[in-house]
């Protein structure tokens, strides 16, 4: 620690302004007024202060680097001038370190010098035949200072603080001798920035922090599976596939009729439940394969088909079916007057199997008479019950086959016919 640092630290701690304020209040004088004069450039300014008390001006020493020190110097000069009179010599001439402010000054000095707070340690001293006394030791800046023995602990701490201040001031005797004065606050040289010793700085290497956001799935890239079991087949679109559940299909009148393969299917597996199909008048009649189906498997339940007058009559295969299997229950078919009469195969059926129950057929006057095969049937099997047929007057007479039947089998009972 240099002498200039010590002198500047101690001079800034003194409270000459406070003592001058107390003096003005004691003698009912106006409050001291301070004026500051700034000299030099802005980067290296010098301050000088002047205090006015009771109309008298007191100038400080020149060359201070701050205003506070300049004002303290002006207050000290004022107190020195006032101490020359005999009345004020007692209260003014007493040094600052002789008063109780030395502890405060020492603490301010430690703060300005970046020292630790002064630590006071008091000890009790006992001597035979004398009053008990106390001694105190203060530590500041790593140096311990011990004061004189006193009767109380408070006085012992003040004595230790005064000892420390006097020791610090003793280092600045040379500076005080140069000015040949007893002033405490003196200007000092400004501190120069010394070349700092390069220190090895340990720079910590920053570690890369992991990203906290979730990784997005990379689209368009496929990973190759090591095991064939791990392969995941994505679902394929089903736009081109047929729906398993059959839907109701509404057909237009231009659709073609059922294929003949439907007849083969029913002929092979017997009765098959089929859906009711409403057809338009332009559709063709059922295929001839339906007759073969009934001839092979006997009675088959079929759906009722409503046909228009333009449809053709049943195929000749129906006669073969009845001739082979005997009585067959058939559906009632309502025909229009334009339909042709029953085929000649019906006569062969009755001739082969005898009496056969047939449905009553109402015909119009334009129908042709029964075929000649009816006569052959009666000639072969004798009396045969036939249905009553109402004919119109325009119908032709019985065929020549009726005569042949009576000649072969004798008298035959026939139903009365109305001509």
From Swiss-Prot:
Null mutant: what phenotype? Short plant, delayed flowering, leaf hyponasty, reduced fertility, decreased rate of root growth, altered root gravitropic response, decreased sensitivity to auxin and cytokinin and hypersensitivity to abscisic acid (ABA). Reduction of several miRNA accumulation.
For this record, an example GO cellular component is: nucleus
Q: Which UniProt keywords apply?
A: Nucleus, Repeat, RNA-binding, RNA-mediated gene silencing
The record's listing under SMART domains reads: DSRM (SM00358)
Q: Give the GO terms filed under biological process for this record.
A: leaf proximal/distal pattern formation; leaf vascular tissue pattern formation; miRNA processing; miRNA-mediated gene silencing by mRNA destabilization; pre-miRNA processing; response to abscisic acid; response to auxin; response to cytokinin
- Region annotated 6 X 28 AA repeats of E-K-I-E-T-T-P-N-L-E-[PS]-[PS]-S-C-M-[NS]-G-L-K-E-A-A-F-G-S-V-E-T sits at 247-414
The record's tissue-specificity note reads: Expressed in rosette and cauline leaves, stems, roots, flowers and siliques.
Q: Which GO terms describe its molecular function?
A: double-stranded RNA binding; identical protein binding; miRNA binding
Q: Where found, per UniProt? A: Nucleus; Nucleus speckle
How does the entry describe the domains? Answer: The dsRNA binding domains (dsRBDs) 1 and 2 are sufficient for the function in miRNA precursors processing and mature miRNA generation.
Report quaternary structure and partners: Homodimer. Heterodimer with DRB2, DRB4 or DRB5. Interacts with SE and DCL1. Interacts with RCF3, RS40 and RS41.
Function statement: Double-stranded RNA-binding protein involved in RNA-mediated post-transcriptional gene silencing (PTGS). Functions in the microRNAs (miRNAs) biogenesis by assisting DICER-LIKE 1 (DCL1) in the accurate processing from primary miRNAs (pri-miRNAs) to miRNAs in the nucleus. Forms a complex with SERRATE (SE) and DCL1 to promote accurate processing of pri-miRNAs by DCL1. Binds and assist DCL1 for accurate processing of precursor miRNAs (pre-miRNA).
Tell me the protein's name.
Double-stranded RNA-binding protein 1
What is the organism field in this record? Arabidopsis thaliana (Mouse-ear cress)
């Amino acid at each position: 620690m240099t002498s200039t640092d010590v002198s500047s630290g101690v001079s800034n701690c003194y409270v000459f302004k406070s003592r001058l304020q107390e003096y003005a209040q004691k003698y009912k004088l106006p409050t001291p007024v301070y004026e500051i004069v700034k000299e030099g450039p802005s980067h290296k300014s010098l301050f000088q202060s002047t205090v006015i008390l009771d109309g008298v001006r007191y100038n400080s020493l020149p060359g201070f680097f701050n205003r506070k020190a300049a004002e303290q110097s002006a207050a000290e000069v004022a107190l020195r001038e006032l101490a020359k009179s005999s009345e004020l010599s007692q209260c003014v001439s007493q040094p600052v370190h002789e008063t109780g402010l030395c502890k405060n000054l020492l603490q301010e000095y430690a703060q300005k010098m970046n020292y630790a707070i002064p630590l006071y340690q008091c000890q009790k001293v006992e001597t035979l035949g004398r009053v008990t006394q106390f001694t105190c030791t203060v530590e500041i800046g790593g140096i311990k200072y011990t004061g004189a023995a006193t009767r109380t602990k408070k006085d012992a701490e003040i004595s230790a603080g005064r000892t420390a201040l006097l020791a610090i001031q003793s280092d600045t005797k040379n500076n005080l001798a140069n000015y040949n004065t007893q002033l405490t606050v003196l200007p000092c040289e400004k501190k120069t920035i010394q070349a700092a010793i390069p220190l090895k700085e340990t720079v910590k290497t920053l570690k890369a922090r992991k990203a906290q956001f979730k990784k997005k799935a990379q689209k368009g890239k496929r990973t190759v599976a090591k095991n064939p079991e791990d392969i995941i087949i994505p679902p394929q679109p089903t736009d081109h596939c047929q729906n398993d559940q059959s839907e109701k299909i509404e057909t237009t009148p231009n659709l073609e009729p059922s294929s003949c393969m439907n007849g083969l299917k029913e002929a092979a597996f017997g009765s098959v439940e089929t859906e009711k199909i409403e057809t338009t008048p332009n559709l063709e009649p059922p295929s001839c394969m339906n007759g073969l189906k009934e001839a092979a498997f006997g009675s088959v339940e079929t759906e009722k088909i409503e046909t228009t007058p333009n449809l053709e009559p049943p195929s000749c295969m129906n006669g073969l079916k009845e001739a082979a299997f005997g009585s067959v229950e058939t559906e009632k078919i309502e025909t229009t007057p334009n339909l042709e009469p029953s085929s000649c195969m019906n006569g062969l059926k009755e001739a082969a199997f005898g009496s056969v129950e047939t449905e009553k057929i109402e015909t119009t006057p334009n129908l042709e008479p029964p075929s000649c095969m009816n006569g052959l049937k009666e000639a072969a099997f004798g009396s045969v019950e036939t249905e009553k047929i109402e004919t119109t007057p325009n119908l032709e007479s019985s065929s020549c086959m009726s005569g042949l039947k009576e000649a072969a089998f004798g008298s035959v009972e026939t139903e009365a016919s109305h001509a």
